[in-house]
């Protein structure tokens, strides 16, 4: 498709209101580069727009000099979209276009985080504005401004409105190029606005931030609304406070309920087929049960959702099985069309020696089942190997014979198991794997006539996109011309070696078990009637992407595992998703993901509102604009801030801070769709804080060291003798070695991190803190009569008081603990004790 130019209205770079109308004549449109001009850039064309869902991504608030920034923002947005199922597998069911639009100024109206404050006078080509206006610091809905003053305050009577501008660009540019109506049901727009601030809104005219770390996730969430017809699952209408309880009636949303699992199963309604499954998004799929997931649909209580998390509740997670089942049906059925695309030989009578065909849209990672029958839908199955074309010449069928074909996407329980509803319907909430969104049939009658000979033709019509590499397990496909009297031939070569196709039009690369590296795949397409063969050539990316991690410095590593760090309260993780760029144009954007304690994969976007920041995990999370991120506590990483105050009896309560040991997995997904192998590490977070040093000792220390007052810190020190700590004094030992014994009587605090003590350790009567992490203690250890100050009241209230903290140490001698304020605790990182362990330490 050619790239067109000179589209849009003319407003002037600094104009506060538009002086033009949305019906401006095409010959008055400005040249590309002028304010309000536009151009359409195809990003992905997989088929006729009438047979696809078409996404048009529109740039707003980007000046002429910032168009490259919009292109980069859209690339990131789309690469994240293609990493999430079902978009990853059904990418070829979607066309994507970028509409570049030149704004007179940078950014949009009423951005609460704009430097210098929100600007009420800024006007962009699409009139986007943060709603409800410039006075709300938590504004996150970004809407097309209305001329009547709603949605940001255009002067009454000002024209055109944001919606008119939106329609203008579609009518004057997009619709003519795509050949579909500007209001077509299979046309989805997404306005990407130039801001680092989190925000967006749903509908068939969705919006999202271009620069926000979560911008691509906002648009996925909004597609859940507009494409998937899904409701919000979060527990509030206004962020700072819980939503009202749900009324005493069953919600209309297909993914909310007030029924118990038993009631749902008995009535065979909602998501009863998924009950009890481990959710893709965290937790176990439940209903309104004691262990169910209460709150959702902007209600704080008395309504239940299927899973602990999902992208419809907290951005970053994937759809759970219930949501994915509906999203895939909406994708394959072209939103409201309700039909899987299947161009074919026109139904009716066909020549007895002719060729009949169907053109299937190809999922990226699995084959469709194509079954040919003689005698109608219940007739004899022909052994065609899933061929898309059938030559009748060799079948010798009698005139009047009925020929039937079924194309089926095997999404049901016997295949992918993505759709468990067996219905034959295709409605929004009842689209089954036996329905027309996943199954299409065609039928012909064999006639008396023979097929006329046709001249040679260009054999290739389309195929898997060649402008980017294929994934190592992708199904490559070719779409050919369809002469009436013969079948176009397709031959495959991988790295110069002939390989057999999976069907007459496809090759499943996953069946070849490719070696690592970049390969070359060539399809040679030949018309038997003559003419030159045509070829399609792809790079095949068989290099798995990686996401190397960098963690903030720990107190120490567990003695038995150098990759298992221990931190007070929190730690940071930076991922650097990386892939081999061979075969790509430039350095591709690679998606990173991580998973906490097996609780659903989560998109790595850094940290909210902080450009290029690491992700912070902490015992109770960090609050950003009334939302919690990175919580290690009960209920998962993402929550509303008010949920952190919940106690027993509240939905999901009580909230318990996440001190203890956690497992974090992380991986990368490259633009080809390869999912790298996950790496993992354990991390232990303990309550407390490092002592602040009054005196620091490092290097060699000859003889015994006595700590008589204040806080003495040994940092990288080697003490040739023993160490003693007097009453009221404190000691912190970091990465040091003590050749003799360590004794403390009546000290305020004793902390050892990653250190070695060759002699015995005796700590008695400490008044505030005993914390020993990742250390090697070669003699006997005795902890007696110590008081451990509780660093987190909520944790101690719900999990019980803890005594001295002993985490991941290696103790060669005996370990004896008695008379402490509470039993010592290892917070999930056991100690290796060679000798006997007695008293309160018997379980360590």
Annotated model-derived regions:
Residues 1-18:
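Secretory targeting and sorting signals
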Residues 25-179, 207-213, 413:
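Propeptide-to-catalytic entry region of secreted or membrane-anchored zinc metalloproteases
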Residues 217-233:
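Active-site recognition of the HExxH zinc-binding catalytic motif
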Residues 344-360, 364, 413-490, 497, ...:
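Low-complexity, disordered linker/stalk regions enriched in Pro/Thr/Ser/Gly
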Residues 370-376, 492-494, 594-596:
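Conserved aromatic beta-strand anchor motif in extracellular beta-sandwich/beta-rich domains
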Residues 378-392, 496-509, 607-608:
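Surface-exposed, flexible coil segments in extracellular/virion-facing regions
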Residues 687-844:
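Extended beta-solenoid/beta-helix repeat architectures
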């Amino acid at each position: 498709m050619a790239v067109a130019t000179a589209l849009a209205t003319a407003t002037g770079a600094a104009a506060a209101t538009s002086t033009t109308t949305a019906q401006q004549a095409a010959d008055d449109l400005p040249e590309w580069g002028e304010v309000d001009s536009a151009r359409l850039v195809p990003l992905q064309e997989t088929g006729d727009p009438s047979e696809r869902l078409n996404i048009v991504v529109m740039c707003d608030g980007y000046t002429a000099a910032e168009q490259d920034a919009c292109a980069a923002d859209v690339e990131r947005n789309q690469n994240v979209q293609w990493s999430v199922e079902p978009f990853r597998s059904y990418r070829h069911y979607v066309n994507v276009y970028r509409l570049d639009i030149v704004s007179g100024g940078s950014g949009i109206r009423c951005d609460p985080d704009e430097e210098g404050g929100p600007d009420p006078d800024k006007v962009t080509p699409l009139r986007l504005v943060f709603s409800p206006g410039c006075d709300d610091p938590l504004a996150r809905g970004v809407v097309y401004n209305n001329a009547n003053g709603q949605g940001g305050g255009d002067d009454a009577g000002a024209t055109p409105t944001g919606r008119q501008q939106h329609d203008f660009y579609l009518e004057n540019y997009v619709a003519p190029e795509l050949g579909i109506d500007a209001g077509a049901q299979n046309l989805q727009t997404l306005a990407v606005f130039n801001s680092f601030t989190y925000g967006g809104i749903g509908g068939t005219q969705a919006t999202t931030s271009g620069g926000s770390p979560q911008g691509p996730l906002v648009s996925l969430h909004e597609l859940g609304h507009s494409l998937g017809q899904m409701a919000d699952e979060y527990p509030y209408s206004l962020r700072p406070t819980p939503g009202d309880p749900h009324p005493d009636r069953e919600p209309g949303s297909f993914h909310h309920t007030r029924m118990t699992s038993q009631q749902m199963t008995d009535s065979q309604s909602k998501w009863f087929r998924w009950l009890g499954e481990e959710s893709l998004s965290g937790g176990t799929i439940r209903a309104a049960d004691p262990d169910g997931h209460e709150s959702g649909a902007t209600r704080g209580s008395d309504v239940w959702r299927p899973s602990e998390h999902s992208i419809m509740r907290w951005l970053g997670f994937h759809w759970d099985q219930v949501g994915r089942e509906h999203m895939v049906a909406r994708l394959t059925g072209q939103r409201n069309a309700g039909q899987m695309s299947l161009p074919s030989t026109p139904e009716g009578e066909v020549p007895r020696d002719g060729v009949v065909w169907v053109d299937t849209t190809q999922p990226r990672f699995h084959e469709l089942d194509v079954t040919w029958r003689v005698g109608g839908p219940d007739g004899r199955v022909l052994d065609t190997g899933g061929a898309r074309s059938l030559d009748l010449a060799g079948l010798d069928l009698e005139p009047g014979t009925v020929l039937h074909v079924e194309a089926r996407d095997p999404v049901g329980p016997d295949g992918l198991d993505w759709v468990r509803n067996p219905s034959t319907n295709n409605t929004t909430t009842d689209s089954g794997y036996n329905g027309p969104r996943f199954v299409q049939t065609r039928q012909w009658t064999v006639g008396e006539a023979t097929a006329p000979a046709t001249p040679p033709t260009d054999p290739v019509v389309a195929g898997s996109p060649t402008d980017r590499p294929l994934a190592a397990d992708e199904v490559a496909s070719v779409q050919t011309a369809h002469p009436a009297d013969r079948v176009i031939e397709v031959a495959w070569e991988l790295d110069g070696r002939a390989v057999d196709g999976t069907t007459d039009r496809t090759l499943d690369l996953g069946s070849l078990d490719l070696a690592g590296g970049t390969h070359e795949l060539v399809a040679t397409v030949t018309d038997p009637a003559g003419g030159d063969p045509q070829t399609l050539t792809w790079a095949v990316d068989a290099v798995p992407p990686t996401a190397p991690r960098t963690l903030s410095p720990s107190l120490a590593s567990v003695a038995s595992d150098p990759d298992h760090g221990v931190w007070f309260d929190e730690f940071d993780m930076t991922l650097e998703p990386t892939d081999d760029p061979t075969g790509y144009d430039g350095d591709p954007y690679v998606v990173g993901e991580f998973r906490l304690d097996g609780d659903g994969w989560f998109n790595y976007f850094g940290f909210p509102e902080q450009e290029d920041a690491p992700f912070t995990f902490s015992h109770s999370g960090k609050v950003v604009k009334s939302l919690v991120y990175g919580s290690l506590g009960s209920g998962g990483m993402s929550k509303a801030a008010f949920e952190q105050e919940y106690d027993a009896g509240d939905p999901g309560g009580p909230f318990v801070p996440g001190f203890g040991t956690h497992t974090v997995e992380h991986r990368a997904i490259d633009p080809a769709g390869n999912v790298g192998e996950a790496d993992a590490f354990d991390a232990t977070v303990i309550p407390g804080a490092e002592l602040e040093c009054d005196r620091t000792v490092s290097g060699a220390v000859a003889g015994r060291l006595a700590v008589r007052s204040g806080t003495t810190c040994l940092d990288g020190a080697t003490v040739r003798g023993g160490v003693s700590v007097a009453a009221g004094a404190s000691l912190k030992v970091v990465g040091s070695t003590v050749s003799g014994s360590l004794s403390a009587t009546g000290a305020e605090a004793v902390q050892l991190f990653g250190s070695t003590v060759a002699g015995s350790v005796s700590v008695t009567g400490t008044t505030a803190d005993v914390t020993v992490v990742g250390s090697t203690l070669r003699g006997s250890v005795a902890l007696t009569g110590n008081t451990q100050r509780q660093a987190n009241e909520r944790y101690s209230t719900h999990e019980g008081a803890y005594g001295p903290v002993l985490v991941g140490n290696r103790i060669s001698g005996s370990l004896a603990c008695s008379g402490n304020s509470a039993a010592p605790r290892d917070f999930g990182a056991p100690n290796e004790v060679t000798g006997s362990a007695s008293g309160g330490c018997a379980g360590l």
